[in-house]
Amino acid sequence: MSVKNFMNNKKGDSGIGTLIVFIAMVLVAAVAASVLINTSGFLQQKAATTGKESTEQVASGLQVMGVNGYQDGTNDANVSKMAIYVTPNAGSSAIDLTNSKLFVTYDGQTHVLAYDDVTDLTTGNSDIFDAINVGTPASEFHVAVLQDNDNSTGNGVINKGDIVAIVIETSDIFGNDGIPERKSVSGKVQPEFGAPGVFEFTTPATYTNKVLELQ
């Protein structure tokens, strides 16, 4: 073999080797790009899910619309029952009241009440305070449904547009036949997830009606 032929063969072998290395580099780059694209898509989906969950966590919660008290109309009668009207916050996810707690503070005592049962009053024909006459114990609250467009509250779940009253018997909780005049009461309805609905008021100087607007 002449020197010229040897050099030509050597150049040919080098060219094939370079081509193989180049193809290998292209394949590695393609695999790496595919991994990066898949990882990027996964991270994007995870970030979107996390962002949605965070938004729901921030937006979720309860709003207290008002508080009414009940006394039987006799002289020196105290507020023996109380109804706390609540609705989900705007943008809130569904709230499960069966896993919610009611905190009520009065006269240095804080009582924690759990869900008892639910009564449908959406027809508007019932006295809201009659809902408590189902034997609700002092450690539990009763839910009276006032507005429910999708029948979700039957299972104790409220969502957008629902309005319920959380009814308790203060005379059983605090004794002394309930809460007298000029007394401070505070509390919150704490859902399992989200912000609580907070209430705070002072009872009137005199009780002139059976149903009293407290907040």
UniProtKB/Swiss-Prot annotation:
MF (Gene Ontology): structural molecule activity
GO biological process terms, semicolon-separated: archaeal or bacterial-type flagellum-dependent cell motility
Record InterPro entries: Flagellin/pilin_N_arc (IPR013373), Flagellin_arc (IPR002774)
Gene Ontology CC annotations of this record: archaeal-type flagellum
Coiled coil (UniProt feature): none
Superkingdom field: Archaea
Signal peptide: none
Record family assignment: Belongs to the archaeal flagellin family.
Protein name (record): Flagellin B1
